[in-house]
Every structure is written in C-alpha cells, then in structure tokens.
Amino acid sequence: MFDANCLKLMFVAGSQDFYHIKGDRTNALLDTLELALQSKITAFQFRQKGDLALQDPVEIKRLALECQKLCKKYGTPFIINDEVRLALELKADGVHVGQEDMAIEEVVTLCQKRLFIGLSVNTLEQALKARHLDHIAYLGVGPIFPTPSKKDAKEVVGVNLLKKIHDSGVEKPLIAIGGITTDNASKLQKFSGIAVISAITQAKDKALAVEKLLKNA
C-alpha cells in the first residue's frame, strides 16, 4: 500500500551515477544505498539510464534484485524507474514513469492494485491532466533547479511550477526533483517531499548529506 510519507526523501540512483569513482560502479551503488538506508531515506528509486548505465537486461535485473533486497532489509519502499515489466516481475512496491515512457493509461492497466505509480510532470497542463487518474499515487515535478544528473533533463521549471500545481487544486502528493542539494532543499518544505541523485551519490559524507536533507525536506 502507498503511504505518502515515503516521499519525504527519495533517493534515485543507478550504477551510472557513480561515474566519478574508480572501481566497480555497481558495488558503489549498493554500498551507497545501504548507507542511505541506514541513514533513513524514505524510499529508493532504481534508475538505469544513459550511456554509462548497464545495458544487459540480465545484469539490470540482477542489480535491481540486490537493491530490492537491501530495501526489504530496512523496510523501505523500492521503486523502479520506467521499466514497468521489470517492476511487475520483481513485485516492486512502485514504478515511476515519465511523459515519454509507456502511455500512462497502459501503465495503470498493468499496475493497478499491484504496485503504486508515480508520474513525472513538467508543466501545469500535465499535472491537471493527471489529477483525475485515480491510480497515480504521486506526481514528480521538475527539474526544479539545474541538474547535472540527467543528460535528457527538461528545461528548469523552478519552485514556481510546484506552487502553481499546488494552488491549482491538484490534490496528489508532489515530490520535487532536479538539482536539489542540502543548501536549497529547505525551499521545498511545503510540498510532500524531494527526490535526489547527486546530493547523495557525490557527497563526501553521505550519511551527513542524508541527515541534512531529511532535516530540510
């Protein structure tokens, strides 16, 4: 079952987000995930995207299972980004899809009553369209600030779009993503939560970063 409290601090990552380290990127992901879970992130979203990501479906599934196992160990929701069929196969807690992925109606048909669904929006129109879809658990809004983590990131929408969606009567929980750091997270406190990538993966002291993000979120 979906609990909106899990949106407070969602860690989003895949092996590609450890391009800056020497050594095995998959192990770096697993080590960082366990540290983040120990530090009380409220959800984890597994996201393999881009040229540096794993390309072999067998390897992707193996890594997803390892991440899921860690999330179960700490009782934290495990969400898969975009890969709807993998999310269903692994019985993930949720799936998060974007505007260019599988049609949201098809995602709902496949996933309803099996796992919760998050949907990315980057315009007010997209949010208004999604508000009547009962099976969408939450909306991910962004990028709020400039982000180094996504090569395909849309134009920065700013905190202003979050406010517009919130004020327009959309009652679904809103989670902010894109360029969020320990310094700017406090600007987003009135919303349901934040999702971060590099704020954790590139932090020198990852446990401290999670602590600060939780305090400011």
Curated annotation (Swiss-Prot):
Q: Which GO terms describe its biological process?
A: thiamine biosynthetic process; thiamine diphosphate biosynthetic process
Where does the chain bind 2-[(2R,5Z)-2-carboxy-4-methylthiazol-5(2H)-ylidene]ethyl phosphate? 147-149, 179, 197-198
Under the heading Gene3D superfamilies, the entry gives: Aldolase class I
Q: Which residues bind Mg(2+)?
A: 82, 101
The residues listed in the UniProt record as binding 4-amino-2-methyl-5-(diphosphooxymethyl)pyrimidine, with positions renumbered to this chain, are: 45-49, 81, 120, 150
Q: What class of enzyme is it?
A: transferase
Entry keywords, A to Z:
Magnesium, Metal-binding, Thiamine biosynthesis, Transferase
> One GO term of the cellular component aspect?
cytoplasm
Q: Which domain of life is it from?
A: Bacteria
Molecular function as annotated in GO: magnesium ion binding; thiamine-phosphate diphosphorylase activity
Q: Which family does it belong to?
A: Belongs to the thiamine-phosphate synthase family.
Q: What is this protein called?
A: Thiamine-phosphate synthase
Gene that this sequence comes from: thiE
